[in-house]
Amino acid sequence: MAKQQIGVIGMAVMGRNLALNMERNQYTVSIFNRSLDITEKIILNNPNKNLFPFFSIKDFVLSLIVPRCIVLMIKSGVATDDTIKSLIPYLSKGDIIIDGGNTFYKDTIQRGYELLKIGVNLIGAGFSGGEKGALYGPSIMPGGRQEAYNYVSPILKKIASNSEGIPCVTYIGPDGSGHYVKMVHNGIEYGDMQLIAESYFILKTLLRLDNQSISKIFDIWNQGELNSYLIDITKDILIKKDDQNNYLIDCILDEGSSKGTGTWTTKSALDLNEPLTLITESVFFRYLSSLKSQRLLASKILCGPKDFFIVLNRDDFIEKIRQALYLGKIISYAQGFSQLNSASQKYNWNLKLGEISRIFQSGCIIRAKLLKNITQEYSSNNNFVNLLLTPYFREIANTYHSSLREIVSISVKYGIPIPALSSAISYFDSYRSAFLPSNLIQAQRDFFGAHTYKRIDKSGIFHTNWYS
């Protein structure tokens, strides 16, 4: 019996669509799912395709060409550990496991270390693009041993999305680097979504625009600098109606939820001493929004501004919102890529940030016109420390910061919560400041804890007896 070229474990929507993507690209695919009825249903719904179902792990593994390539599209954590343990008795030296879940990068490092003891390679690969991306072409971020990647790269390039004819996949680096990049990708996604939500809220509350009008504004924005997947879907979300002819957006509970990757990103930023302020505020906002019962109580007890906003030039104000959103987006990406650079140095990953920005240009959730500018800046100079310091982005920042400042000021004056936008201008002002009040903080630390300080006029470390 002929053996299959690749195997996929996990037939939820991502695994199923990835298997169909592989099959469409002329690969024979073995599939396995813990719930057997799901496997049977997939075969029933996809007749005459090179999908081969198996109902035991042993039969599944033995159905594959050696060295085997097995893709895991399952829930991260215990489920991944259990699945790998079930595979081990039937694997051979040189086999490759690709973990395509949203796995914590340190778990990937540990699993890769343990598997390498028995000669099995682990590739931790981030897959972005959602269920549609999995089917028609995701952005793929594989990390692990270079030789393992070289073996599986032909199939990854076949199934990946492409930008200007080049597949949106590249070798990220060793061990957990692929999952780390996917984690930061998701953090940037949090920031993007929060900035868009705040812009929508300003248009809705301050300008009192209806959903149709806001959708048209987002459609116009999507034709220019802000062109992106998230802006594109937002314009459609705003005008979607339910079966009662109500705008669906107005019927959705305002409690943000998450799966934890944003939290991982912010925790890593703290470990690296990276000021990931905008993305962190976006994570915190989801936590705050989930306090619905408390917010309802507070809305009856705590007072806010009573003034009624009157705009003199609506089109001019909308343009300022657009500029504020774009600069906020730039700052979010600047923080995310700065964190990638810090992680690369700490873990010796040698991340190629220009290549990473390139593979984000198609297939993934954060794909945006902006990424072409990022790639271009890295191709011109790969040694800069922050996107805001590069020619294109500093020109935008120096032009748009006044709009961001005005939108934040007006929103605060009228009681509109905008944590991401306000974080953006705060970061911008802090980053461009040659002097910050941290001198006082250092003096306070030395006063109560003898933590010492440095001076600007003398070299060395100093401590003062503040009580004398």
Swiss-Prot record:
Which EC number(s) are documented for this chain?
Answer: 1.1.1.44
UniProt entry tagged with the keyword Nucleotide-binding? no
Biological role stated in the UniProt entry = Catalyzes the oxidative decarboxylation of 6-phosphogluconate to ribulose 5-phosphate and CO(2), with concomitant reduction of NADP to NADPH.
Task: Spell out the catalytic residues.
Answer: 182 (proton acceptor), 189 (proton donor)
Which EC class is this protein assigned? oxidoreductase
Where substrate is bound, by residue?
102, 128-130, 185-186, 190, 259, 286, 445, 451
Note the PROSITE patterns from the entry: 6PGD
Task: Give the domain of life.
Answer: Bacteria
Q: Report the transmembrane regions from the record.
A: none
Q: Which UniProt keywords apply?
A: Gluconate utilization, NADP, Oxidoreductase, Pentose shunt
Q: Which GO terms describe its molecular function?
A: NADP binding; phosphogluconate dehydrogenase (decarboxylating) activity
Query: What is the designated name of this protein?
Result: 6-phosphogluconate dehydrogenase, decarboxylating
Q: What reaction gets catalysed by this protein?
A: 6-phospho-D-gluconate + NADP(+) = D-ribulose 5-phosphate + CO2 + NADPH
Work out whether the entry's keyword set contains Membrane: no
What InterPro entries has UniProt attached to this entry? 6-PGluconate_DH-like_C_sf, 6PGD_dom2, 6PGDH_C, 6PGDH_Gnd/GntZ, 6PGDH_NADP-bd, 6PGdom_BS, NAD(P)-bd_dom_sf, Pgluconate_DH
Q: What SMART domains does this protein map onto?
A: 6PGD (SM01350)
Q: In which pathway does it act?
A: Carbohydrate degradation; pentose phosphate pathway; D-ribulose 5-phosphate from D-glucose 6-phosphate (oxidative stage): step 3/3
